[in-house]
């Protein structure tokens, strides 16, 4: 009787394992991936900033947008934030907006980070990772350079120097 129970249990485990493998293969090979690519239109979204104001990407049409995905725990993100903050007022006057998308952290953590670095550009929080997933963001930081027409011009993964950020901001001036 025990041998039969073990056989049934092993068969059930094997079936569950095969179903999981089948599902993984199906989702990887047969479902459409909607990764954002250079030359494509940036997916629109609405997120709320630390002050409670809504930011809709499409509201920035006519401006260049430096769309930066980041986290408070991300050391490379921490290194580039002061550079972004320093360049923000200069390029804002020239029609370029910096919009930092925090990836689902508690508002209090993000506020403390912003206060610590004196950040002045808009910071929005993607609480359910919907925007993160829509843009198919992998490692942080990841930045999308979006032109005045809403087209993705470049995707940068990894930390940037001040010179890199300045060059990229220049490239999306309207």
Curated annotation (Swiss-Prot):
Localization, UniProt:
Cell membrane
InterPro entries according to UniProt: AhpC/TSA (IPR000866), Thiol-dS_OxRdtase_ResA (IPR023555), Thioredoxin-like_sf (IPR036249), Thioredoxin_domain (IPR013766), Thioredoxin_ResA/DsbE_sf (IPR050553)
Tree of life domain: Bacteria
Q: Which Pfam families match?
A: AhpC-TSA
- Show the PANTHER family listed in the entry: THIOL:DISULFIDE INTERCHANGE PROTEIN DSBE (PTHR42852:SF6)
Keyword field: Cell membrane, Cytochrome c-type biogenesis, Disulfide bond, Membrane, Oxidoreductase, Redox-active center, Signal-anchor, Transmembrane, Transmembrane helix
Topology relative to the membrane? Single-pass type II membrane protein
Q: Name one GO molecular function term.
A: antioxidant activity
Start and end of every Thioredoxin domain? 36-174
Taxonomy-wise, where does this protein's organism fall, top ranks first? Bacteria, Bacillati, Bacillota, Bacilli, Bacillales
What stretches pass through the bilayer?
11-30
Keyword Iron appears in the UniProt entry: no
In this UniProt entry, which cysteines form S-S bonds? 74-77
Name the major location: membrane
Q: In which pathway does it act?
A: Protein modification; cytochrome c assembly
Q: Which GO terms describe its biological process?
A: cytochrome complex assembly
Q: Which GO terms describe its cellular component?
A: plasma membrane
User: What function does this protein fulfil?
Assistant: Thiol-disulfide oxidoreductase which is required in disulfide reduction during c-type cytochrome synthesis. May accept reducing equivalents from CcdA, leading to breakage of disulfide bonds in apocytochrome c; following this reduction heme can be covalently attached.
Q: Which family does it belong to?
A: Belongs to the thioredoxin family. ResA subfamily.
| Name of the protein in its database record | Thiol-disulfide oxidoreductase ResA
């Amino acid at each position: 009787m025990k041998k039969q129970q073990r056989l049934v249990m092993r068969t059930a485990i094997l079936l569950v394992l095969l179903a999981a493998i089948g599902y993984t293969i199906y989702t990887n090979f047969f479902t459409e991936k909607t990764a954002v690519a250079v030359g494509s239109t940036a997916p629109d979204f609405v997120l709320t900033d630390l002050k409670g104001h809504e930011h809709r990407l499409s509201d920035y049409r006519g401006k260049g947008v430096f769309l930066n995905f980041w986290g408070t725990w991300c050391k490379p993100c921490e290194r580039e934030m002061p550079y972004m903050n320093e360049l923000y007022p200069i390029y804002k006057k020239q029609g370029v907006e910096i919009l930092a998308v925090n990836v689902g952290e508690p508002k209090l953590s993000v506020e403390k980070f912003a206060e610590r670095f004196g950040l002045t550009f808009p910071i929005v929080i993607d609480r359910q990772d919907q925007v993160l997933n829509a843009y198919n963001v992998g490692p942080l930081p990841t930045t999308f350079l979006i032109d005045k027409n809403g087209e993705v011009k470049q995707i940068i993964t990894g930390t940037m120097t001040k010179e890199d950020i300045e060059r990229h901001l220049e490239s999306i001036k309207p």
